[in-house]
């Protein structure tokens, strides 16, 4: 029986390839900060060959790893914040009208990261500021289809068209293969995202094809798939 390991992380898909150094169509670059507390890996899927080899759509997948992310220390969070900001700016370019979408169900803990981010976001679209601000930010928590009866992509598309959004930044929970990556890994990608993918409930994708504007997805793994734990248990039992 072919039991594949489920993961949303491009870096884990690459790790699962036997000959990871020879993957046509896939480019990989890794950077570690000065004190080696933050590792950033950029995986670029260049073409259809790369899509087939990695199992991910063409585009960039940036993975920021920091094992100390769970610690409540400003000295740890500040360099991580700077790294995340820098990578986001690289992907976003000079877009001025941004919609941040907090995907997920705030009533389900592992699926609530999107709404929690929105709760702590400083939005600016409603502010009456002199001149034209460099960045206009608005935000929405569209809920999940079981709550609204509406596909998330339809809600977001309507908002984008109404307020002329240039770029969508979607925040969501992801699924990881390794429990060691839970809560201490951030993946950014310019390929969009399927709402609910982290909890196994894929809906229509938030993508440039479906929304008519660029989509940046930011995800944090909050769950692993049961088979991952089962395989680990079987391995220990056979020792």
Where are these regions (language model features)?
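N-terminal amphipathic/basic leader segments beginning at the initiator methionine
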Residues: 1-58
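An N-terminal, well-structured beta->alpha segment
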Residues: 49-93
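Short glycine-rich or small-residue beta-strand-to-loop segments that form or flank ligand, phosphate
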Residues: 65-67, 97-108, 139-143
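Gly/Ser/Thr-rich loops at beta-strand to alpha-helix junctions
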Residues: 103-113, 146, 173-177
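Glycine-rich phosphate/diphosphate-binding loop of Rossmann-like nucleotide-binding domains
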Residues: 105-133, 139
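A structural-propensity feature for long, helix-poor, extended segments
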Residues: 136-159
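Glycine-rich phosphate-binding loop
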Residues: 153-204
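Conserved small/polar residues in nucleotide/adenosyl-binding loops
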Residues: 228-235
């Amino acid at each position: 029986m072919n039991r594949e390991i489920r993961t949303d992380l491009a870096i884990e898909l690459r790790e699962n390839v036997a000959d990871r150094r020879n993957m046509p169509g896939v480019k990989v670059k890794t950077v570690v900060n000065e004190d080696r507390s933050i590792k950033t890996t950029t995986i670029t899927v260049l073409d259809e060959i790369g899509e087939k080899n990695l199992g991910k759509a063409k585009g960039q997948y940036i993975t920021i790893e920091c094992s100390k992310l769970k610690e409540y220390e400003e000295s740890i969070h500040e360099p991580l914040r700077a790294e995340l900001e820098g990578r986001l700016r690289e992907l976003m370019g000079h877009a001025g009208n941004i919609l941040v979408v907090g995907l997920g169900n705030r009533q389900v803990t592992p699926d609530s990261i999107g709404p929690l981010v929105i709760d702590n976001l400083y939005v600016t679209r409603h502010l009456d500021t002199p001149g034209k601000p460099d960045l206009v930010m608005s935000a929405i928590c569209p809920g999940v289809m079981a709550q609204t009866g509406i596909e998330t992509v339809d809600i977001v598309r309507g908002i984008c068209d109404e307020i002329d959004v240039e770029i969508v930044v979607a925040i969501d929970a992801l699924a990881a293969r390794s429990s060691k990556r839970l809560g201490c890994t951030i993946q950014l990608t310019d390929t969009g995202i399927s709402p609910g993918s982290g909890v196994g409930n894929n809906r229509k994708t938030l993508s440039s094809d479906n929304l008519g504007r660029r989509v940046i997805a930011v995800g944090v793994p909050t769950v692993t798939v049961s088979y991952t734990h089962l395989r680990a248990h079987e391995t220990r039992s056979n020792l």
